[in-house]
């Protein structure tokens, strides 16, 4: 309880410890060797100049901070300084890239804590959610996973928090405007998933609560209009720039239409892959399933149904986790990094399960 009262500070401390290899520059040569991988980034966080502008904006903003490169301890430790020719990668100082990944990880950790608090959980559960995220196989060594994917997930999580706060109120234009603006940003940070996931989660959540008419209220309609205006404005601005039409064509064909066409072709044939990946990458927390009180599972879900209006936060977490997993399975996702959007709500639900274990279950786990 004492640590939970200062949970964000403790999580920042643990993030700093996990980030030490990053700050020491251990990835600098690996960044160059890995090159640019699928979806515009390699495992190192290198952005592709053709795709997803938000990570570029983030890197550009960081590069404007005076002395930002000096945060990397690689500048002061013999043997890890970049060799000749590696000082610049993708137009950015090479030492900036690991720092950007580490900061993206910090945003994701703190927003997982914020998601737990926003959905009505106490400080203990929120603190435990951050610890679960930090200690799962999927996120162990979190700062060295692709920075662009973590930044996308952080934006998506913040958009979800704003939308949730807006949907549970009768009139909340500020929350919904912020939420849909962040949805537009997440669409430019992660492609199709950034656009589809928050809209589908909102739809399922409103249907679940029996408040679907809330989506057609004036603030909801105006906020959705803001989303369309922002995306159209960005597309128009890019189209009139050098190579803008080719960029838009690449984004639409490869990142928006291609996943839908591939999903139509597969028709769920490879949906088991993402579930199997999740079971492995969420270790050791996957083992929690062995110690849950399955005899009370009916009572548990009955409570969720009965209290769907009194405890909307729980419904939002379950809708987020189920919808995200279903979309990933439908799209035939087969890469671990694509699980990132699922991890924040799953971390909160896992933390709830850990804290509510019986004495026998706790000892067994």
Q: What name fits each language-model region?
A:
Residues 1-363:
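Membrane-integral, polyisoprenol-dependent glycosyltransferases
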């Amino acid at each position: 309880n004492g640590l939970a009262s200062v949970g964000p500070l403790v999580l920042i401390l643990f993030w700093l410890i996990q980030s030490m290899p990053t700050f020491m520059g251990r990835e600098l040569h690996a960044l160059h060797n890995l090159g640019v991988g699928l979806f515009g980034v390699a495992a190192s966080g290198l952005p592709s100049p053709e795709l997803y502008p938000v990570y570029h904006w983030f890197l550009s903003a960081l590069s404007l901070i005076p002395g930002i490169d000096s945060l990397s301890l690689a500048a002061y430790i013999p043997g890890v300084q970049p060799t000749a020719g590696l000082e610049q990668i993708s137009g950015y100082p090479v030492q900036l890239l690991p720092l950007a990944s580490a900061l993206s990880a910090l945003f994701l950790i703190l927003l997982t804590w914020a998601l737990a608090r926003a959905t009505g959980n106490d400080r203990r559960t929120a603190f435990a959610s951050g610890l679960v995220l930090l200690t799962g196989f999927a996120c162990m060594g979190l700062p060295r996973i692709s920075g662009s994917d973590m930044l996308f997930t952080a934006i998506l999580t913040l958009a979800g928090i704003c939308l949730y706060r807006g949907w549970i109120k009768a009139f909340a234009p500020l929350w919904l405007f912020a939420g849909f603006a962040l949805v537009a940003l997440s669409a430019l940070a992660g492609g199709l998933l950034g656009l589809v996931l928050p809209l589908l989660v909102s739809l399922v959540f409103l249907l679940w609560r029996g408040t679907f008419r809330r989506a057609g209220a004036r603030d909801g309609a105006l906020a959705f209009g803001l989303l369309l205006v922002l995306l159209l404005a960005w597309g128009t601005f890019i189209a009139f720039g050098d190579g803008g039409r080719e960029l838009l064509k690449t984004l639409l064909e490869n990142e928006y239409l291609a996943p839908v066409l591939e999903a139509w072709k597969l028709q769920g044939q490879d949906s088991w892959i993402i579930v199997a990946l999740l079971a492995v990458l969420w270790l050791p927390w996957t083992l929690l399933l062995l110690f849950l009180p399955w005899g009370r599972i009916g009572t548990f879900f009955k409570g969720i149904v009965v209290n769907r209006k009194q405890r909307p936060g729980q419904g939002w977490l379950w809708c987020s986790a189920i919808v995200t997993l279903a979309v990933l399975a439908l799209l035939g996702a087969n890469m671990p990094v694509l699980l990132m959007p699922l991890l924040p709500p799953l971390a909160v639900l896992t933390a709830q399960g850990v804290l509510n274990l019986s004495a026998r279950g706790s000892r067994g786990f």
